[in-house]
Swiss-Prot record:
Organism this protein belongs to: Nandina domestica
Protein name, entry field: Photosystem I P700 chlorophyll a apoprotein A1
Entry superkingdom: Eukaryota
EC number: 1.97.1.12
Keywords: 4Fe-4S, Chlorophyll, Chloroplast, Chromophore, Electron transport, Iron, Iron-sulfur, Magnesium, Membrane, Metal-binding, Oxidoreductase, Photosynthesis, Photosystem I, Plastid, Thylakoid, Transmembrane, Transmembrane helix, Transport
């Protein structure tokens, strides 16, 4: 840490009125590019317009201008998010059975969408209980609203209006910070100040205010709701905030105010800041008092973290110093030069952020079911399945995006002349070793993971169950995973003496938690079947990484095309006369990586869906006997590929296939339509450009004959455009098919 004298002068960090506001300019399509602004000559123009509209690098090479555009666009994004949130809350206020659900969350299912009877589609309004007819929703909003203490639809209305106001404010901010007071480049590059403000402000004060809301509003309201008090009788949020006696009736230590805090007698607050672990048996969610305690602790950590970096006061850490001091015995210059990369290349910065956020999103997916945070979430199986699936897909897309922007950084922003012997240079210099080893790992994992299944299918087909890998024949128990489970299950009596129960029921040990006769959570047993499918996970993840990492490491050059950097991020082939050089651009690696990401995530969500229905979700009778949805068939059925096809895909597709004529019929139509969208993608992926150009010229001839030829000359999609359209429909079709399949199934049986 270096201590310097404070800097005397205050820097002016904005430019006033840098860009005039012009509706005329915005109304001209392609105004950001000289070529596009001329208007269309061929139909390729509209595709280029879409490809380049947000590629700010192609509009200008001025880093300050690019930074301002990105900054301004972020406000636009936030505006759309507020608008979307407002819509969610408005539906909750206007079209939902929220108040009915609040009074009986175990028997009434959440609905916030009512179909209007225009052409007879009111069949979609199913009976969700309590005399309400609508579409069952699986977003988890009702559970979040209850956890935050919302007790009436009027409160939802007010929040929806508030979100609209914020959406307008964000739109204004986006305009203001580009056209009226635009930050200078130095402001965008002041990482220490940015870290301090984001850590202390967004994460620190954000968590603190949420903890405050939970203690003063959520906890008392949920206390009343759990006790069965009618939501209309519960005092309103402002009454709890203004009247301390109300809170003191529920939590006596509130009568003492802040005295225990300042006298360091903090244990007084243990009534509402707890450390219990496990789930609340009434709601099947984490203890809300644990959650409040967690947010208070997080707030303290981030408030401290937000005061660690050196800004105007000459005290604290400098990021450049930290990075340059980071050298290991095998890393040459280490992190030297990374500071310059990350402050001048937003692609490099974005790649890191996407990789971390994508990984974090996948971690969230796994926590949402193993530590369900909201009341009555764990017993809403449709919502549990939707939240897991949603966060897995999002995480997958973000990680592929990380590779895409890392490759764009390599092509556009990497300067080989200034990088020597730092970490990145060393990785690039032994990229052949990295990729060939990774390739070997993929081959090993692929043959061995599928080999285990093929062995089982063969033995099963030949009627030799005693020779299969299964829990009842040749066992392949996941011993390391079971050891980890056991360690965590025993933690409260060993490594975490302060906790009453382990962090998650899934570890084992404790009994189950059931709410209203439905299982919320219980210890999840792992066996041979999980061992097999986990190696498929390892295989698909490694192949995805192989494709993406090869795209990044060979983005600038390869033995095949040494001057790849000059060809750009996306190009079809290395020009005429060089056969075998197609599909080598960094863009093509992202394109291929998307398919493997889709493979990887599909296996994960299939595994989760079946495992939970087989071993966790189900009903419990008065004697305490649990009946699982698919009766524990995962362990014996999922050990063959035939079992996956027969007992998962086919058996569980019966609900979506037989949904016609019921309130689930929309899922049947989506299932069909999404299959069609997926199949449509193959037309783009399997066909060559010349085929379409010939067909188009034939059609243009016919138009000319009839004197109806358009002024804009029709062109076949370029190779890259065709692939982009193909992969988009492939993913959209595949994801929507899975969505319809999962929801029709789980809403029918859950």
């Amino acid at each position: 840490m270096i201590i310097r004298s404070p800097e005397p002068e205050v820097k002016i960090l904005v430019d006033r009125d840098p860009v005039k506001t012009s509706f005329e300019e915005w109304a001209r399509p392609g105004h950001f590019s000289r070529t596009l602004a001329k208007g269309p000559e061929t139909t390729t123009w509209i595709w280029n317009l879409h490809a380049d509209a947000h590629d700010f690098d192609s509009h200008t090479s001025d880093l300050e201008e690019i930074s301002r555009k990105i900054f301004s666009a972020h406000f636009g994004q936030l505006s759309i998010i507020f608008l979307w949130l407002s819509g969610m809350y408005f539906h909750g206020a206007r079209f939902s059975n929220y108040e009915a659900w609040l009074s009986d969350p175990t028997h009434i299912r959440p609905s916030a969408q009512v179909v209007w009877p225009i052409v007879g589609q009111e069949i979609l309004n199913g009976d969700v209980g309590g005399g309400f007819r609508g579409i069952q929703i699986t977003s988890g909003f009702f559970q979040i609203w209850r956890a935050s203490g919302i007790t009436s639809e009027l409160q939802l209305y007010c929040t929806a209006i508030g979100a609209l106001v914020f959406a307008a404010l964000m739109l204004f901010a986006g305009w203001f910070h580009y056209h009226k007071a635009a930050p200078k480049l130095a402001w965008f590059q002041d990482v220490e100040s940015m870290l301090n403000h984001h850590l202390a402000g967004l994460l620190g004060l954000g968590s603190l205010s949420w903890a405050g809301h939970q203690v003063h509003v959520s906890l008392p309201i949920n206390q009343f709701l759990d006790a069965g008090v009618d939501p209309k009788e519960i005092p309103l949020p402002h009454e709890f905030i203004l009247n301390r006696d109300l809170l003191a009736q529920l939590y006596p230590s509130f009568a003492e105010g802040a005295t225990p805090f300042f006298t360091l007698n903090w244990s007084k607050y243990a009534e509402f800041l707890t450390f219990r672990g496990g789930l609340d048996p009434v709601t099947g969610g984490l203890w809300l008092t644990d959650i409040a305690h967690h947010h208070l602790a997080i707030a303290i950590l981030f408030l401290i973290a937000g005061h660690m970096y050196r800004t105007n006061w000459g005290i604290g850490h400098g990021l450049k110093d930290i990075l340059e001091a980071h050298k290991g015995p095998f890393t040459g210059q280490g992190h030297k030069g990374l500071y310059e990369i990350l402050t001048t290349s937003w692609h490099a910065q974005l790649a890191l952020n996407l990789a971390m956020l994508g990984s974090l999103t996948i971690v969230v997916a796994h926590h949402m079911y193993s530590m369900p945070p909201y009341p009555y979430l764990a017993t809403d199986y449709g919502t549990q399945l939707s939240l897991f699936t949603h966060h897995m897909w999002i995480g997958g897309f973000l990680i592929v995006g990380a590779a895409a922007h890392a490759a764009i950084f390599m092509v556009r922003d990497y300067d080989p002349t200034t990088r020597y012997n730092d970490l990145l240079d060393r990785v690039l210099r032994h990229r052949d070793a990295i990729i060939s080893h990774l390739n070997w790992a993929c081959i090993f994992l692929g043959f061995h993971s599928f080999g285990l299944y093929i062995h089982n299918d063969t033995m099963s087909a030949l009627g030799r169950p005693q020779d299969m890998f299964s829990d009842t024949a040749i066992q392949l128990q996941p011993v390391f995973a079971q050891w980890i489970q056991n360690t965590h299950a025993l933690a409260p009596s060993a490594t975490a003496p302060g906790a009453t129960t382990s962090t998650s029921l899934t570890w084992g040990g404790g009994g189950l938690v059931a709410v209203g006769g439905k299982v919320a959570l219980l210890p999840i047993p792992l066996g041979t079947a999980d061992f097999l499918v986990h190696h498929i996970h390892a295989f698909t993840i490694h192949v995805t990484v192989l494709i993406l990492l090869k795209g990044v490491l060979f983005a600038r050059s390869s033995r095949l095309i040494p001057d790849k950097a000059n060809l750009g991020f996306r190009f079809p082939c290395d020009g005429p006369g060089r056969g075998g050089t197609c599909q080598v651009s960094a863009w093509d690696h992202v394109f291929l990586g998307l398919f493997w990401m889709y493979n990887a995530i599909s296996v994960v969500i299939f595994h989760f869906s079946w495992k939970m229905q087989s071993d966790v979700w189900g009903s419990i009778n008065d004697q305490g006997v649990v009946t699982h949805i698919t009766g524990g068939n995962f362990a014996q059925s999922s050990i063959t590929i035939n079992g996956w096809l027969r007992d998962f895909l086919w058996a569980q597709a019966s609900q979506v296939i037989q949904s016609y004529g019921s309130s689930l019929s929309a899922y049947g139509l989506f299932f069909l339509g999404a299959h069609f969208v997926w199949a449509f993608s193959l037309m783009f992926l399997f066909s060559g450009r010349g085929y379409w150009q010939e067909l188009i010229e034939s059609i243009v001839w016919a138009h000319n004959k009839l004197k109806v030829a358009p002024a804009t000359q029709p062109r076949a999609l370029s190779i890259v455009q065709g692939r982009a359209v193909g992969v988009t429909h492939y993913l959209l079709g595949g994801i929507a098919t899975t969505w319809a399949f999962f929801l029709a199934r789980i809403i029918a049986v859950g």
